[in-house]
Regions:
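Conserved N-terminal phosphate-binding loop of PLP-dependent enzymes in the Aspartate aminotransferase
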Residues: 1-451
């Protein structure tokens, strides 16, 4: 089948989603609240979820492997999380606007699981966390360039929205490629692109820019599923420390998914700063930036540093403090849900990893039966399906995959009850039990017969 033929079946399969999309595009650009939620010819519209299942507006149900791009590691509506949230709601105040005990309670739990984090601040998303981590690096070092790994994503703001999906230049000396309109030209000069899993080339570039580089920010597992080598991680930690460059781990995707202690627990490496999000918020918007006390204390408020205190207007010391604020930072309902999620994961994490391994092995066998080159690439509870024989180590290796065939399979899978955005990574949850895996394998066999 051609992709166009598959799309015709898909349109007939989901007429209400199509209609809702046509209405949405009249008032929302592209019909979606975030660009990542769109796919051709239109995305499915959901109305509910329970456990491993998503329910769409046309009456179909799907095993959910998108997990909202990773946060839903317990699936939809996990009882212990719902119960904790309802108790918090019954307190009568959703939001205080003041400090509260849950802030320190969550911070202590995160410190326990992530020993590199001595202190932390809360944000409202992973994007906010990475943005604030870079401001911290600038404030601490007095330098304003950063190193960013090719193919790594750290949010939708200007300095890091370079070379995420695009590759240009020598493989050992990538060029910065803008991934959006509206990026200031100087961002290309201030963001140095580094080759992932190439320690020698990365070291050479860092040594060239050491006097002007504040930090290297990276996903220890590229796009959440392609792991760095231990050699690269050990070497990068050594060279950044030697050159006085801060090392920032963006663990928004890997936190609580590669291991309970994230990728840094898996690799046994302590970064200077860590960014968390996704799983930590249990499906609600939350982020964390944490790390060394001497760096975090740059954000501690001083008398006279409140930018909103008019009485300090003539003697403000705001410029002496790293400003950080947010109405919803440390939201009590979200911290409640996050603490409940961590409590479940401390009992269930090994099970989820085991189910992930079973799913990967079963899918590899199905593709082998069809004689289609395929490998699952991942670590912990996340992986992706790449249709290539090339060993996946670097960002540009991923581009050898047959994404055209993978996309056809994914659309056919939607019509067999398996939900993921076409070509996206798989995020496994605590509710993907053996029956769900068997359903998945059968759906794959049905879909691939139609190819």
């Amino acid at each position: 089948m051609t992709l166009e033929e598959i799309w015709k079946e898909y349109e007939a399969f989901a007429p209400t989603s199509k209609k809702q999309h046509e209405e949405a595009v009249k008032v929302i650009p592209g019909g979606v609240a975030a660009n990542i939620k769109y796919f051709d010819p239109f995305p499915l519209h959901m109305k509910g979820g329970n456990g491993p299942w998503l329910y769409d507006v046309d009456g179909h149900k799907y095993v959910d492997y998108l997990a909202s791009y990773g946060p839903l590691i317990l699936g939809h509506g996990y009882p212990e999380v719902k119960e904790a949230m309802m108790k918090q709601i019954e307190n009568g105040a959703i939001l205080y606007g003041t400090p509260h005990a849950l802030e320190a309670k969550m911070a202590e739990k995160i410190k326990e699981l992530y020993p590199s984090i001595e202190m932390l601040r809360y944000t409202n998303s992973g994007t906010e966390a990475t943005l604030f981590s870079l401001r911290m690096a600038y404030a601490y070092t007095g330098k304003y360039k950063i190193g960013k790994l090719e193919g790594h994503y750290h949010g939708g703001y200007n300095q890091v929205l370079l070379s995420v999906n695009s590759a240009k230049g020598d493989v050992r000396r990538p060029e910065p490629i803008p991934e959006s309109l509206g990026l200031e030209p100087f961002q290309k000069e201030n963001t140095i692109i580094l080759p992932f899993n190439d320690l020698e080339a990365t070291t050479a570039i860092l040594e060239e820019h050491q006097d002007e580089m504040a930090a290297v920010i990276m996903e220890p597992v590229l796009t959440g599923y392609c792991p760095a080598t231990q050699e690269f991680m050990d070497g990068l930690r050594e060279v950044t420390k030697r050159l006085g460059i801060l090392l920032i781990f963006d663990e928004v995707k890997t936190g609580f998914r590669v291991s309970l202690g994230g990728a840094q627990g898996y690799y046994h490496i302590k970064p200077d700063l860590t960014c968390l999000g996704k799983v930590l918020g249990a499906g609600l918007p939350m982020g964390v930036v944490g790390g060394r006390k001497d760096i975090l204390m740059k954000a501690a408020p001083l008398s006279g540093s409140d930018v909103f205190d008019a009485s300090n207007s003539k003697r403000s010391s705001a410029a002496d403090v790293l400003f950080h604020s947010g109405t919803y930072n440390g939201h009590p309902l979200i911290l409640t849900a996050g603490l409940a999620t961590i409590g479940v994961l401390e009992k269930k994490f090994d099970y989820i990893v085991g189910q992930t391994d079973k799913l990967r092995a079963g899918l590899e066998e199905i593709f082998k039966e069809k004689d289609i080159p395929m490998q699952t690439v991942g670590v912990g509870t996340v992986f992706n399906i790449l249709l290539t024989d090339v060993k996946i180590e670097k960002f540009r290796d991923i581009q050898t995959s047959d994404f055209a065939t993978r996309k056809k399979i994914d659309y056919l899978l939607l019509m067999e009850g398996i939900y993921n955005k076409p070509t996206n990574r798989y995020s496994v949850s605590a509710v993907h039990d053996d029956n769900i895996l068997d359903f998945t394998f059968e759906a794959y066999r049905k879909a691939m017969k139609k190819l």
